[in-house]
C-alpha cells in the first residue's frame, strides 16, 4: 500500500466559495499535505491559499473526478473532501458516483459537507 500523502478537494460550482473558505480556515494543517483538486476548485483554493501545494487535475466534467479516482485506487489519497451542491443537477453525475464508489471501496475517508470535513480533518493523521 502506498503512503497516503494527498488530500483531495472537489466542490460543485455553487460550493467553491465554501471550499476556499474551508481551505483558508485550515491552511496551516493543509500545508502539511499535497492537495489534489479538480481544475476550477484547485484554482480557487490556490488563490485563497497561495502557500498550499495544489496539484490541479482537469475540470470534473472533463475527467478530473476520474483522475482523482485513479489516485484513490492507487491508495495515494488520505481523504476526499467533496462539497456537493444537492440542489443543482449535475450532467456528470455518473462520474461523481464512480468517484464516491472508489472512496468507499478503498476505505478512504470522505466528507461531503463542511461540518463533516471540519470534524474529520484534524483526525486524519491518527
Curated annotation (Swiss-Prot):
Highest taxon in the source lineage: Bacteria
GO function term, MF aspect, one: methylglyoxal synthase activity
Coiled coil: none
Catalytic activity line of the entry: dihydroxyacetone phosphate = methylglyoxal + phosphate
Annotated GO biological process: methylglyoxal biosynthetic process
Any one Pfam family match given in the protein's UniProt record, by short name: MGS
Annotated HAMAP family: Methylglyoxal_synth
Function: Catalyzes the formation of methylglyoxal from dihydroxyacetone phosphate.
Protein name: Methylglyoxal synthase
Organism expressing this protein natively: Allorhizobium ampelinum (strain ATCC BAA-846 / DSM 112012 / S4)
Amino acid at each position: 500500500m502506498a503512503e497516503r500523502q494527498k488530500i483531495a478537494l472537489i466542490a460543485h460550482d455553487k460550493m467553491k466559495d465554501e471550499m476556499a473558505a474551508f481551505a483558508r480556515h485550515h491552511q496551516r494543517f493543509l500545508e502539511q499535505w499535497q492537495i489534489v483538486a479538480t481544475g476550477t476548485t484547485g484554482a480557487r483554493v490556490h488563490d485563497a491559499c497561495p502557500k498550499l501545494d495544489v496539484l490541479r487535475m482537469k475540470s470534473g466534467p472533463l475527467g478530473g473526478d476520474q483522475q482523482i479516482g485513479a489516485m484513490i485506487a492507487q491508495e495515494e489519497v488520505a481523504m476526499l473532501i467533496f462539497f456537493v451542491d444537492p440542489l443543482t443537477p449535475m450532467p456528470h453525475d455518473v462520474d461523481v458516483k464512480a468517484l464516491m464508489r472508489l472512496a468507499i471501496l478503498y476505505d478512504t475517508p470522505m466528507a461531503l459537507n463542511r461540518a463533516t470535513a471540519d470534524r474529520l480533518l484534524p483526525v486524519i493523521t491518527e
